[in-house]
Swiss-Prot record:
The keyword S-adenosyl-L-methionine applies. It comes from Escherichia coli (strain SMS-3-5 / SECEC). It catalyses: a 3-demethylubiquinol + S-adenosyl-L-methionine = a ubiquinol + S-adenosyl-L-homocysteine + H(+); a 3-(all-trans-polyprenyl)benzene-1,2-diol + S-adenosyl-L-methionine = a 2-methoxy-6-(all-trans-polyprenyl)phenol + S-adenosyl-L-homocysteine + H(+). The keyword Transferase applies. S-adenosyl-L-methionine binds at residues 44, 64, 85, 129. This is Ubiquinone biosynthesis O-methyltransferase. HAMAP family: UbiG (MF_00472). Signal peptide: none annotated. GO terms for biological process: methylation.
């Protein structure tokens, strides 16, 4: 997709795209800006695979795939994976890394709304990780994800809660004190309360199945899933 087509799409934040374009070459640097994504990927993958009853042989869509960290890991589990993103550079990095790794992933520069118009009801599993807070209309993304999954299929979302603690942890702590992610990565005004996300889900054919928090311990420098959704959280939904 060229720049002209990108500008035509309404549900794209060009400043957000530019942020990730600027650091795309370091997406697979395990000690770089995306180190936290590499660290939490096994937790995400395990949660998705367990809640979906395994990924082997399933058709999976990763919305907002970036450089392909989660998409590749799901393909390694035996899934047929398509990765969507609107960033040209991250997709180029994802394609090259998949080629070097011998992993088959179909990467497409397209919005989820455009993809839903052509591929409704075609996926067993849809994942949308840390993407909703980077678009102007996150509800539109939720709606499109619901359209893309098969009846009985699974849709997973992850995002950041909007409150004082999440601002302190995800912005002040992660960006300015611990420097885990680049400054300016997050805008607390775009964070999404669980009740808001569940409200959008309720307006689709999806049904909530499970919600869990993703927690970081700065003392042990480790991540874990568990109760409490006051900062990062993941939501498992299923199509009716």
């Amino acid at each position: 997709m060229n720049t002209e087509n990108l500008l035509k799409n309404n549900n794209v934040d060009h400043e957000e795209i530019a942020k990730f374009e600027a650091v795309a070459s370091r997406w697979w640097d395990l000690e770089g800006e995306f180190k936290p994504l590499h660290r939490i990927n096994p937790l995400r993958l395990g949660y998705i695979a367990e809640r979906a009853g395994g990924l082997f042989g399933k058709k999976v869509l990763d919305v907002g795939c970036g450089g392909g960290i989660l998409a590749e890991s799901m393909a390694r589990e035996g899934a047929t994976v398509t990765g969507l993103d609107m960033g040209f550079e991250p997709l180029q990095v994802a394609k090259l890394h998949a080629l070097e790794s011998g992993i088959q992933v179909d990467y497409v520069q397209e919005t989820v709304e455009e993809h839903a118009a052509k591929h409704a009801g075609q996926y067993d599993v849809v994942t949308c990780m840390e993407m909703l807070e980077h678009v102007p209309d996150p509800q539109s993304v939720v709606r499109a994800c619901a359209q893309l999954v098969k009846p009985g299929g699974d849709v997973f979302f992850s995002t950041l809660n909007r409150n004082g603690k999440s601002w302190l942890m995800a912005v002040v702590g992660a960006e300015y004190i611990l420097r885990m992610v680049p400054k300016g990565t997050h805008d607390v005004k775009k964070f999404i309360k669980p009740a808001e996300l569940l409200g959008w889900v309720d307006q689709t054919s999806l049904k909530e199945r499970h919600m869990t928090g993703l927690h970081y311990n700065p003392i042990t420098n480790s991540f874990k899933l568990g109760p409490g959704v006051d900062v990062n959280y993941m939501l498992h939904t299923q199509n009716k």
